[in-house]
Design a protein with these regions (language model features):
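N-terminal nucleophile
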Residues: 1-152
Length: 152
């Protein structure tokens, strides 16, 4: 009830399950959506994967693997997108979080982590810490970021 009430108060439109199921839209080319959140001294990260077309049965990408696609702790939060196998092999989000713990600013972390990925590997990252917020991607990825303040 809390989330639904908040969404309605923000002007979000409601639709029935039938409307969602019968849009006729092809969802085979979906993308990952990620966010990092700061609420005072608390941080969180969330990801929703679009997956990949023609995945090998049983494939597990970076999103459900904590420390790979996302990570958060008392110092900040990280969310990544792109080539899931490359992100998972590098434990990307956890390693980026370690840079937060070492006192690095998010604006410095983003290009540092992007450099871990060789072209043409698609990669993007968003980082928030007590020192600020930053996001970026290599040339293989389109991305956008938004910073908002919500008062409840």
């Amino acid at each position: 009830a809390g989330a639904a009430e908040f969404a309605l108060n923000q002007g979000c439109k409601t639709v029935s399950q039938d409307e969602i199921a019968n849009t006729g839209k092809d969802f085979s080319t979906t993308d990952t959506v990620g966010c990092v959140i700061r609420d005072g001294d608390q941080f969180a990260a969330a990801l929703s994967t679009g997956g990949i077309d023609d995945a090998i049965p049983g494939r597990v990408g970076d999103v459900p693997l904590i420390g790979c696609g996302l990570y958060s702790g008392s110092e900040g939060a990280v969310a990544a997108t792109g080539d899931g196998e490359a992100i998972a092999m590098q434990m990307t989000a956890f390693r980026a979080y370690q840079l937060i713990e070492q006192g690095m600013d998010p604006k410095s972390i983003v290009p540092t982590v992007i450099d871990w990925f060789k072209k043409p590997t698609a990669f993007g990252i968003i980082v928030v810490s007590k020192l600020g917020f930053a996001g970026g991607a290599n040339e293989s990825m389109a991305w956008t970021a938004s910073e908002i303040e919500i008062q409840l």
